[in-house]
Amino acid sequence: MADWHWEPVTDGLLDELPPAALAAVRQVAEELTVRESMTFLDGREFTGEPPGLRTVQRGPLMLVYLTDVRGERVVIIQVNWIG
């Protein structure tokens, strides 16, 4: 997985989430990070068109995220928790 990681777009994005939501965000974000590292093998050397904003939903969780291929990171833009 090289140096790939995930991070929220702002420091306080996850602050108000209940523990179950935070655990779900961490799990999904880790899975996305692994998947993206396997999809974009060139990482920092990537020269193609990067993907735009994407959404993933798991149960009561919906994440909007952006893959920064050259930065080898998944940036969580928005979190919705219906629970």
Model-derived segments and their meaning:
Residues M1, H5, V34-E36:
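Charged, low-complexity, helix/coiled-coil-prone segments
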Residues G12-A23:
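Surface-exposed, Lys/Arg-rich phosphate-binding patches that contact polyanionic backbones
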Residues M1-D3, L22, Q27, L53-G83:
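Enriched for short, Lys/Arg-rich terminal
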